[in-house]
Amino acid sequence: METAYSVKNIPIRLTYERWYHIIENHDDLASYFHDVLDTVENPEFIMQGNQGTLKATKNIGKKKWLVVIYKELSEEDGFIITSYFLPGKPKGKIIFATVQFLINQ
């Protein structure tokens, strides 16, 4: 198990079981383990997801956005649910954004 810390400094777990689930369904992510963790810790922006989830998002190349869905259960615990690539900037309600992201808009 690996842990990343969200922008609210909450530890977010990525278990090996979850990682295997992610790469089983999204094999294009197989070499992006550390990028998934880094996206939770250093997202360009975070969107509100469904059922209390959050979507940490980072642009990692031309027309390539990494999205990590996670849930903060408490101030001391959270976990990654899944992750995937999108060909364009995700749409949704932004609840956090870096200054650099806002400048580039």
Regions found by a protein language model. Give the residues of each.
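Ribonuclease/tRNase effector modules and their secretory precursors
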Residues: 1-105
